[in-house]
Amino acid sequence: EGGLTLIDPVMGDNGEVYSSYTPEMCTRMRELCAIADLITPNTTEAAILLGRDPVSAPQSECEAVEWMQALYEQYGASVVLTGLDYEKGKVGSGCFEGGESTVSLHERIDCYYPGTGDLFAAVMLGELLGGATLRSACVRAGEFVRDTIAYTAEQHTDPNFGVQFEKLLPRLILPEK
């Protein structure tokens, strides 16, 4: 009681349910999301939670807001929808809380690294626990993940090792200039 329950419904990405997931596991994830204060699906996971085709994804900001509102109405939790890419050359996330929505997009960096969703959720949760609003936590997490992707791409490391966020961690604890 008095805490914050964040559920990141890890079930798929890029329009596909993970091969290790069964339909029963997806049903159980829906049940888990129903007890959350905040859910953070990517567009594939949001489609699964809404009973839609996982390949479908919002094609505009208006559709993204509709999806977030539908998730809010179905699960009763605030929503952060990640992996929004309806605008050419951009990617980002949206948040929906208390009837208010915000979408934040930034320039896409043409690289893929596993674990960026986990990093996003962790940074966002840290910001929320530090007193930030959902909107500002979502924006800050998106900027941090974007910066770690850019930094990692510059290092030319094997993408299978994920993003190299450690050197950028001071940005999260030091005051912004």
State the predicted function of each range:
Residues 54-64, 128-139:
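Short, charged, surface-exposed loops that flank catalytic or proteolytic processing sites
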Residues 3-13:
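Membrane helix-loop-helix hairpins that form the core translocation module of multi-pass transporters
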Residues 101-114:
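Short pre-catalytic strand/loop immediately N-terminal to key active-site residues, enriched for Gly-Thr
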Residues 48, 111-134:
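Short, small-residue alpha-helix embedded
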Residues 19-102:
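Conserved phosphate/ATP/ADP-binding segment of small-molecule kinases
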Residues 1-5, 74-77:
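A short helix->loop->beta-strand "cap" motif at the edges of active sites that frequently abuts
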Residues 135-177:
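Charged C-terminal helix
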Residues 11-13, 45, 83-87, 107-110, ...:
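Glycine-rich beta-alpha junction loops
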